[in-house]
Structures are given as structure tokens and as C-alpha cells.
Design a protein with these regions (language model features):
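Flexible loop/turn and low-complexity linker elements, especially glycine-anchored beta turns
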Residues: 167-171, 176-177
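Short beta-strand micro-motifs in enzyme catalytic cores
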Residues: 34-38, 99, 141
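Residue-level signal for functionally critical sites in structured catalytic/ligand-binding pockets
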Residues: 3, 32, 155
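Negatively charged, low-complexity tracts enriched in Asp/Glu with abundant Ser/Thr
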Residues: 1-26, 60-126, 152
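Short acidic DE-rich linear segments
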Residues: 2-3, 176-181
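Intrinsically disordered, low-complexity regulatory segments enriched in Ser/Thr/Pro
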Residues: 44-70, 76, 106-166
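Short edge beta-strands and adjacent turn/loop segments
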Residues: 25-43
Length: 181
């Protein structure tokens, strides 16, 4: 078993133990700093959840386990919000390596499909976007939702999405404080 496979198995076990609704299926290694990130699925909803720890260069197993354990309630809150509000949506939470964007680079919009369901987005300005993105750099996350009809849009950001912002901010704050960054 390679070192990458050993790390993947060890950290996957810790994450899945902490968050039973998360299953991990991929591992990424940053060749420059030797740190890892893991990607998997949130069960019961369409979407993906990535606990990306590259930004913090976490290599100590005990520290990693402490962070996962201490932030369990925050991630559960995020899961509850997504499950309640976005069960019919396709949601992806990722950390794209190539994208480091400040909040002021984004525009806000709500897209409605023919049934009246809301597809909430915060997206970078694309010329012809059928897939629009919500991205916040709180623990490096992005949420993308496919808009069924992007001709219908509103400039208002609903309160429930602000709840998700708050969870990201809290998770970022907790990890930052834990690592004394």
C-alpha cells in the first residue's frame, strides 16, 4: 500500500466516523506541500461534500482528528440546512485549486424553473452560463446549482442561503482559531 493510500484510508476513516452521512471516495495530494484533501458524497441528497484541508497543510493525525471532532456540530448544521432546503437540487461544495476569488467579484441571483422551484446562485460573471456557481472562501467551498431557466432571475439573496454563509464562516473561524492562523 502506497503512502497516499495509507493516508487516504486513515483520514477517510476519521471523516466517515465523525460524519456518518459523508462517504469519501477520492483523495487529492498537493505535491508542493504534501498535504491532502478528500472528496465524497453527502448521502441522501444529490451533491458532493469536500473537506479540503490543503489550505492549512494539516499533516498531524491528532490535530486533524481534533479539528474534525470539534467541528462536527457545524458540519451537521450545514447538512441539516442543505437537507431541509435543497433536497431537490444538485449541490456541489468544492475547493477549486485555480480559483481564489473575493466576495466582491460575484453577482447574486435566483433562477426559477418552469415549476417555480428556486435555483439560488451566487455566481461569477459568465458570458453564457448554464451552470452558475456560488463560491465562498470559508474553508474553501463552492456550491454550484444548475439553472433550469436562467432567463428568470432576481437580485435578491434569500435568508436560507445566508444561513449557509454563516455556517461556512463559523467553520472557517473554528479551524483558523484551532490552528492559530
Amino acid at each position: 500500500m502506497s503512502h497516499k493510500e495509507e493516508v487516504f484510508k486513515k483520514v477517510t476513516g476519521m471523516i466517515e466516523e465523525a460524519y456518518p452521512f459523508v462517504s469519501i471516495d477520492k483523495c487529492y495530494r498537493d505535491e508542493l506541500d504534501g498535504s491532502y484533501s478528500f472528496r465524497g458524497a453527502i448521502n441522501l441528497i444529490e451533491g458532493e461534500f469536500e473537506l479540503d484541508l490543503r489550505e492549512y497543510q494539516i499533516k498531524d493525525d491528532h490535530l486533524l482528528k481534533d479539528i474534525i471532532t470539534k467541528n462536527k456540530d457545524v458540519v451537521y448544521k450545514l447538512y441539516d440546512i442543505i437537507s431541509d432546503e435543497y433536497l431537490d437540487y444538485t449541490i456541489e461544495i468544492v475547493r477549486p485549486d485555480f480559483m481564489y476569488v473575493r466576495d466582491d467579484k460575484f453577482k447574486y441571483g435566483i433562477f426559477l424553473d418552469k415549476t417555480g422551484k428556486k435555483y439560488v446562485t451566487v455566481h461569477k460573471v459568465f458570458e453564457d452560463a448554464t451552470l452558475v456557481s456560488f463560491y465562498k472562501q470559508h474553508v474553501g467551498v463552492r456550491m454550484t446549482i444548475t439553472a433550469a431557466d436562467e432567463s428568470k432571475r432576481s437580485a435578491n439573496l434569500p435568508d436560507d442561503l445566508n444561513d449557509i454563509f454563516d455556517v461556512f464562516k463559523q467553520l472557517r473561524k473554528n479551524i483558523t482559531e484551532e490552528l492559530n492562523l
